[in-house]
């Protein structure tokens, strides 16, 4: 299952259809922090994050961490938060054909995995956790 057309549509909607691809959805050398600045970024931040959430829940669990990370800044997005969203778009540019694959003949099994990062957020020491379930070796959440 793949949503290449949807990826093309959202890249075009946010003027990222000709962007250069990157190999990961998050730049781990950049730490985003909340801002109390009165001005917000002049970009469709919430609309973009919503479009990414739809894609994430349907066929792209590989962007779940990145989308969850940028969604923390929905209340008062700043330029650096918008840059992080655009990085996810750049990752999608290079992985348009990625999706979930159910192969015929796979044994019907169901597995679950989880992980946690305790107090890993440098701004407020909040913890993060995540999980995924595999059905016939394909992620379903």
Residues covered by each model-derived region:
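Long, low-complexity, charge-biased intrinsically disordered regions
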Residues: 1-141
